[in-house]
From Swiss-Prot:
One of the record's GO cellular component terms: centriole
Lineage, broadest ranks: Eukaryota, Metazoa, Ecdysozoa, Arthropoda, Hexapoda
Biased composition (Pro residues): 893-907
Quaternary structure note: Interacts (via C-terminus) with Klp10A. Interacts with SAK.
Name of the protein: Centrosome-associated protein Alms1a
């Protein structure tokens, strides 16, 4: 490494104190010394001078950015004459590589150097070519980085207000290489182990294995030093994130660093100065000629790059130099050797015209440099002076990119454009989409949208320069001669272009086979063309004068633009057979007048040449606009001009098609009117466009000139060819709606795609079922459904009014009695109920009539059900508005036949959900379509409804608990009466024989239980009221009828069915119907008020008592004592907290049920929470079951001795406490009065004895005995005793074992080897 560095030459920042200038800079000396110390090992100076802050590997080579580098003497100086005093120099460290004479010469040369001005964003890049900007300097060149204090606000605003198409610093994670695209996500540890991309650097994030991997090549500290100098990234560099999207553009750039192998790890940031020995003029010539390159040569290079990508999957997509170096080391060396010559060989025609254009470009650049220098010295505004070179450089690079796009899309022989153009357009579309995705993810990094942020003064200057150059060019003569010469050049260049085009049409396998031969041919051609080009340059310089070259260049640009336009029109005409199917128009529209729906069958296209609509031109224009703008090297003026040209071409294309489209629209509308009326015709189709005829005509009239690429409006006109129909595959941006109905094969199907399986047709439609139905309701069936519902409501209102008049005319004997009852009931109401009745009177007539109509419908249904039972018919309900109620008999009442409920909406009839495989979204179909009923059934409104229901349920629970607390206070008054009787009975029992009374009570309880069960089986004593919410389902009628009697009741007596008619929008109503099934006598043996502790909760209904009703926004909730209620459904038993259902025990005064016993109530549901009172008329004096005994009472009955002892102990303790208090008081008095000890002793003898001597249950000895007895029986004591016994047993066993062993050994030792069992050793 050190030898290499010695050969290359070290460059370091002047960090020592003796090299500093007199005045200090903004960069502190400590930071400068730190960076210089780190730069010794990493050659950071050369890196900072020749690299950029963002990754320069994005463009395929190490772009250099000379930070105010001193040009050679041959170049014109573009710097001010005043050196900034705070600027610092960077000198080459030559103490160990140069002699003192060379150092002295270098110092003298440094004193004579011109001073670099305060650098702007784009002043840096004006020496470099637009794409490959390698500044070739001498090894001993001085690099000066001026550091200027941005004190003036005008200078500081340059970086703020300047909005050019340059990319910002990119410090994100590096994008994946093509080898890693299809692999799984790798952890940082596996990346380090497998690829070794990163290397730790203590001062920066510089160390990356590959040049293209590096995201920010210098540390934050070093970047702050550079930003302190107002240094910015050049215009044409791209961030790392856009590598994949900009590959086609990157691959065309020549890489000047190809002849240097990729250094390992952190060495990739080093720059070899030995390679930069050529002069700046030769570098500019080669870069200019490469940027004005031949389109055929670039096509050839593109095909070569495709060949290398096909043959080797290991190419690196991050640099174009590595793309072509993967074929082999020898081939890579040849390519590197010829790659620099390749740029000079690329010219539009291989003859004199290219030499002239090169010379013209050089002279125009020199002239612009001089003009810019003049302007910068004249104009004092630093914004304009810094803007000028950037405008000129961006103008040059935009010209080159324009020609490159031109050469990519343009070709003289248009007969060969057929399949090649289509494939190239597809590839450009995919690349543009990929880049747009990258930009959308990582922010707007490329100039995909136009930003015109130039100041007026700068724009005026640009326009003046353009006008001046235009006048100079137009004055030059001999334009006709150059035209003829240009035509000859075009004719000579045609055969070579044909040869290159034939090479591009090879397949992938053939390319792999003949790749070595093509490589050799290319190398030979490159050498041959290089020699020819040098000769042509010399001849062109001698032949043409400066004026002729200028005029010829101007004419050549015009001719290229004309050829470009002609090529685009040719591509449009040749691409019509491959036009996008989304822009084809449907054929054979069918109108169903019942819903006003146009159903157009869309099938596969039989004739590919049927695309005569301007959709292809629109797509091509949009893709062309995106591909040209994304090149991001266009200047502002060229962007505006480009957009205007494309918009003008598209508008011209649309004008030619407008007359035919209007004629086809009128003919299709006439055909639609001829379709006969009838039921909704179902057409088998993979897609169905449904819209109103008015909306389709509007979409036809208003066609946007340039629609968005993914929101193309499908115009509802038929194709001119009869057998061709089209797809419409994406959601249209206009008012038209893509829907799908039940797929039924029909004879109208014209192709095989129409008679696909129904499951396959479902998936051909991109919309979900909920979206389809929502769009259908918005367009088709809402108005007709609403009209049908309103018509049915009107007929029902008329029928109910006639029925009401009929009932009022009938008089019965019990009419006066019922009036008296209702008057007394309303007189007992709370004033809040009067207010509610007043509110009901003030409601509109529609709500009143709707409530009347619904209640009357339920009445008629109830009358039909009651005819089958033995009970008398229920009376007419009491209306809260004050309608007279009469009791009627079915024999005397001719009930008019009820009308059928309205049929469900048409979209429910059309849908056959069994055939559909997509998931159907659950719908809530409301009964009437008032208040936008169709829109309330979409997915969003369904979610909102669920959220609203949850909030109302929670609020309802809170309010219910609060109301229950208030009601419990009212019930306490009724409970106290019954509790007093129980207390009296219990006291009498306590005074007498407690045990016998308890035994008698248990016997009575055991005798009463089977008796009550027999009563419940034979003669049920309860009438249970269950609430069951009947919601209208989507498949059935919107109005649920009450079930038959006893369908969901446990005891099969009565059931109240609450039916929510419409719970959305307007105020809806709940119809509560009591269906009586049996009438039997009730004999209640026990009475008393009920409590809420048993499973059967009861309510007390007295003559004037009332139950509270808490109204939520969707349903009425009766508030009882119980918080939960059981609602028996068909499957399970649910617990509802918001509806309390009570079972009421009634009296048995009458053998037959009176008409007053069954009173139908109308519960009104309002959209907001309102509490009001509803009266329940009592049938007579009803008794309540007796309350179950409390735990204390049950303890008294079970263990009376324990209770007596407890009371005695409590009394003794209270007495002892009183005695202690009295003794304490007397003792205080004695102490306060006595003055001597004798008097104190005398008073103490007079004190009462202590409490424990006067009141005692047992003595101390008895207490100790009792305590010890209890302690001995404790489990801890017993366990300890057992433990001790076990230890004693083990100890004795061990002792016996030892004695036995000792005696046995002694016997054996004495010679007794046999042991008789009868002998006792122990």
């Amino acid at each position: 490494m050190r030898a290499k560095r010695g050969a290359v030459g070290k460059v370091m920042m002047s960090g020592s104190r003796h090299n500093k200038l007199a005045e200090s800079s903004r960069v502190p000396p400590l930071a400068r010394e730190y960076i210089s110390a780190m730069a010794t090992d990493r050659e950071l100076d050369r890196f900072m001078a020749l690299s950029s802050t963002a990754s320069s590997g994005a463009s395929g080579s190490t772009h250099s950015c000379a930070l105010g580098s001193v040009p050679p003497p041959g170049c014109a100086s573009m710097e001010h004459e005043s050196r900034p005093e705070s600027g610092h120099r960077r000198r080459t460290k030559s103490s160990d590589h140069r002699s003192p004479d060379e150092r002295g010469e270098a110092k003298e040369q440094l004193r004579e150097l011109s001073v670099s001005p305060p650098p702007s964003k784009h002043k840096i890049s004006q020496f470099t070519s637009p794409k490959s900007e390698v500044t070739k300097t001498k090894p001993n060149e001085y690099t000066i980085i001026p550091i200027v204090l941005a004190s003036s606000p005008s200078f500081r605003s340059v970086a703020v207000t300047q909005t050019m198409s340059q990319s910002a610093e990119d410090i994100r994670t590096p994008t994946k290489s093509p080898q890693m695209q299809n692999k799984k996500t790798q952890t940082p540890e596996s990346v380090l182990k497998s690829h070794k991309r990163l290397e730790w650097d203590p001062s920066a994030d510089v160390g990356y294995c590959k040049r293209a991997m590096s995201m920010s090549n210098i540390s934050t500290l070093e970047r702050s030093v550079l930003e302190d100098c107002s240094w910015r990234q050049p215009t044409q560099q791209r961030p790392e994130a856009n590598l994949d999207g900009v590959q086609p553009l990157l691959a065309e750039e020549p890489s000047p660093m190809l002849d240097k192998p990729t250094p390992p790890l952190a060495c990739s940031t080093f720059v070899n100065r030995s390679e930069r020995t050529k002069s700046l003029n030769s570098g500019m010539e080669s870069s200019l000629s490469s940027n004005k390159g031949d389109p055929r040569k670039k096509c050839q290079r593109k095909s070569r790059r495709q060949d290398s990508e096909v043959s080797s999957c290991q190419t690196d997509c991050r640099s174009s130099s590595q793309k072509e170096s993967t074929q082999g080391s020898s081939e890579a060396k040849d390519i590197r050797g010829n790659f620099t010559t390749e740029g000079t060989q690329c010219s539009y025609n291989r003859n004199d015209t290219e030499i002239d254009s090169i010379m013209e470009e050089e002279e125009s650049i020199d002239r612009r440099k001089k003009d810019d220098l003049r302007i910068s010295s004249r104009v004092q505004d630093p914004q304009i002076s810094s803007r000028r070179p950037s405008v000129s450089s961006s103008r040059r690079e935009s010209l080159s990119s324009y020609r490159r796009d031109d050469s990519r899309l343009n070709s003289p022989n248009s007969s060969r454009l057929g399949s090649e153009v289509s494939s190239r357009v597809e590839s450009s579309r995919s690349s543009s989409r990929r880049e747009s995705q990258t930009n959308s993810v990582y922010g707007s990094l490329s100039a995909s949208s136009f930003d015109y942020h130039m100041h007026m003064a700068q724009e005026v200057e640009v326009l003046k320069h353009n006008q001046r150059r235009q006048q100079e060019m137009e004055v030059e003569p001999k334009k006709q001669l150059e035209k003829e010469q240009h035509q000859n050049d075009m004719q000579q260049g045609e055969p070579k272009g044909r040869e290159l085009k034939d090479k591009n049409h090879h397949s992938g396998r053939e390319q792999q086979e003949i790749q070595p031969l093509m490589r050799d041919q290319r190398k030979a051609e490159q050498r041959h063309e290089k020699d020819h080009q040098l000769e042509r340059e010399q001849q062109g310089i001698q032949q043409l004068s400066k004026g002729q070259r200028k005029a010829k260049k101007r004419e050549k640009e015009r001719e290229q633009e004309r050829q470009y336009t002609a090529a685009q029109f040719e591509k449009i005409r040749s691409n019509r057979r491959h036009v996008n199917k989304e822009n084809q128009k449907p054929e054979n529209p069918v109108v169903n007048p019942s819903t006003g729906v146009t159903a157009s069958t869309s099938t596969t296209s039989l004739d590919v040449g049927s695309g005569s609509r301007p959709g292809g031109e629109l797509d091509l224009g949009i893709d062309l606009l995106c591909s040209l703008v994304k090149s991001r090297s266009l200047s502002q003026g060229q962007k505006k001009k480009l957009v205007r040209d494309i918009a003008r071409r598209i508008s011209c294309l649309e004008l030619t098609e407008s007359s035919t489209s209007s004629r086809s629209l009128s003919s299709s509308s006439k055909e639609q009117l001829k379709v006969p009326t009838g039921s909704l015709q179902q057409v088998a189709a993979t897609n169905t466009n449904q819209s109103n005829a008015r909306s389709s005509s509007k979409a036809e009239r208003i066609a946007p000139p340039v629609p968005a690429p993914r929101k193309r409006a499908a115009i509802g006109s038929s194709s001119p060819l009869p057998e061709s129909v089209s797809y419409s595959g994406s959601t249209s941006g206009s008012g038209e709606v893509i829907t799908q109905k039940t797929n039924i094969p029909n004879r109208n199907a014209s192709t095989d795609a129409d008679i696909e399986p129904l499951d396959l047709q479902d998936w051909l439609n991109p919309m979900t079922l909920s979206e389809i139905e929502f769009e259908e309701r918005l367009k088709g069936g809402t108005d007709s459904e609403r009209r049908r519902q309103l018509h049915w409501v009107k007929t029902e209102i008329n029928r109910m009014q006639e029925f009401k008049n009929l009932l009022e005319n009938i008089s019965l004997p019990s009419k006066s009695q019922k009036k008296a009852n209702t008057e007394s009931a309303t007189a007992a109401q709370i004033p809040s109920s009067m207010r509610c009745m007043g509110d009901q009177k003030e409601r509109p007539d529609k709500e009143y009539l709707l409530r009347q109509e619904m209640s009357a419908e339920a009445e008629s249904k109830e009358m039909e059900n009651s005819e089958t039972t033995t009970t008398p018919p229920p009376p007419v309900r009491i209306e809260s508005v004050g309608v007279n109620v009469t009791n009627s008999d079915p024999s005397t009442l001719p009930a008019p036949p009820p009308t059928q409920p309205p049929p469900p909406p048409p979209h429910l009839n059309q849908r056959n959900l069994q055939n559909r495989k997509k998931m159907a979204t659950p719908l809530l179909v409301s009964g009437s379509s008032t208040s936008g009923g169709g829109r309330s059934e979409s997915v969003c409104s369904f979610v909102q409804q669920r959220q609203r229901q949850f909030r109302e349920h929670y609020q309802n629970q809170q309010q219910q608990q609060f109301v229950l607390l208030q009601q419990q206070k009212l019930y306490q008054l009724q409970k106290q009466l019954n509790q007093q009787k129980d207390i009296l009975i219990q006291r009498q029992q306590h005074c007498g024989q407690c045990a016998q009374c308890g035994h008698q009570r248990t016997c009575i309880h055991q005798q009463n239980c089977p008796r009550r069960q027999q009563e419940a089986e034979e003669q049920p004593d309860e009438r249970e009221q269950y609430m069951q919410m009947q919601y209208a389902q989507a498949a059935g009628s919107a109005y649920a009828t009450p079930h038959q009697s006893g369908s969901s009741g446990a005891d099969k007596n009565e059931a109240i069915y609450y039916q929510v008619v419409n719970s959305q929008g307007v105020a809806s109503y709940v119809q509560a119907t009591m269906v009586s099934t049996e009438t039997q006598n009730e004999a209640s043996a026990t009475g008393g008020a009920g409590g809420s502790a048993i499973t059967r909760s009861t309510t007390t209904t007295t003559n004037s008592s009332s139950s509270m009703m808490c109204i939520s926004s969707d349903m009425s909730v009766p508030m009882g004592m119980m918080n939960t209620c059981e609602t028996t459904t068909t499957t399970t038993t649910h617990q509802y907290d918001d509806v309390a259902c009570q079972r009421v025990r009634r009296g048995h005064k009458e053998t037959t049920m009176n008409a007053e016993s069954m009173q139908r109530q109308t519960l009104q549901v309002r959209p907001r929470a309102i509490s009001y009172v509803i009266q329940f008329t009592p049938t007579g004096s009803s008794e309540v079951i007796e309350k179950p005994p409390s735990l204390q009472d049950q303890l008294q009955l079970a263990r009376p001795e324990f209770c007596a002892n407890a009371k005695q102990r409590k009394a003794i303790l209270n007495e002892m406490q009183m005695i202690r208090n009295a003794r304490r008081q007397e003792l205080d008095n004695v102490l306060s009065q006595s003055t001597s000890m004798e008097a104190l002793n005398r008073h103490l003898e007079q004190l009462p004895p202590p409490a424990n001597t006067r009141v005692r249950l047992f003595t101390t000895r008895e207490m100790k005995a009792i305590t010890s007895k209890r302690c001995k029986n404790l489990p801890e004591v017993l366990a300890a005793q057992s433990r001790q016994e076990e230890e004693q047993r083990r100890r004795s066993n061990r002792l016996m074992r030892d004695v036995f062993n000792k005696r046995l050994k002694s016997r054996v030792a004495s010679g007794q080897i046999s042991l008789n069992h009868s002998m006792a050793i122990m």
